[in-house]
Amino acid sequence: MPTCLGGGRKLSMMQNIWHPNEIRDLNLEQHAFELDNDGLTIVPPEKTGVSMEKIDRAIDAILARFTEVTGGCPISIKDGPMGELDFGEGRKSRFPGVADAVKQDQPKQTQTTLGQLIKLDRSLRDLAVNQVANALRDYIVGPEGNNAPQEQGELPPKARRLSNGGSAFVKWQGDYGYGPNLGLHCDQNGSAMPWGRNSLACNGMWTLTEYSKEGGALCYVPGSHKSMKVPSGNGEAHLAVPVEAPKGSLVVWHGGTWHGAFPKLTPGLRLNATIYYRHMMVMSQENLRVTMENEPWDDCENPDLMRELIGFDDRFPSLGNKRKYPKFIGSNVK
């Protein structure tokens, strides 16, 4: 396959202005090409610099957290949750066509998400600062882009920042999924359009188990980031392909890439650790929800508008872990 850097071939757009040496030094030229061309790349375990011991430690930390937040439900990679879980009323999915698991005539819910991973263990913090992952994120997010003068040969500051503390999507066998359109969406869909070449958001997902289509793998539409728009939710699923990868792989994709997931049809867990990044400009200059909380923000002609402008009722940025986790209601181990 062609490469985007070197070899006498036409250089990619970003190579002229952004960290080509880092990509070359880490032997990531092919992955940079795939990000440009397909909007997603899979880095095999042997190229990430992360040992299987560290991957297993991350797994143990996530499974221990699952047992903690569910109120004691045992769980393993082989068997999945070994107990009955009550998901409560839940909340309506943002994906069109997704079954409401609360209704009795719909499949039982078989997935939950754990947040704030980098609080849990050193292994997960190491994944967040992995050199290979960050080189690829730098490549598609691009530089800070400020107007400060640079010394000759000096590179502009890097612009990627953590958007959250990482999430683990814990998924087990069942018919419940993201609906007929596979939940296709893109991560920067809340950003103003039209988008450009640079990614405003970027995911780096570590496959903590083997990924296969039957095993509920991530899916994506190759090249969809070039459309610079969100999927319509009508009929794009046939374009999606599975992200199939061995345990310990790194999957990086552009914020404009359409992606979702297949339902998991096999026993055991499908587990990942997903580190979500953003361009540094995708934020406010001042955290007004904090700085104005105890100030007279409502002393104005239109308090309702001021509340909206400050963003007191916005979902993001979260000021703590407000996730609702399923609760362990009984063992199913015989």
In which residue ranges do the predicted regions lie?
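Catalytic core of non-heme Fe(II) oxygenases with the double-stranded beta-helix
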Residues: 173-244, 284-292
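Non-heme Fe(II)-dependent double-stranded beta-helix
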Residues: 2-37, 43-184
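Conserved double-stranded beta-helix
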Residues: 227-258, 262-334
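A conserved hydrophobic position in a structured secondary element of the catalytic/binding core
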Residues: 119, 221, 253
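Short hydrophobic-aromatic micro-motifs
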Residues: 42, 206, 251-253
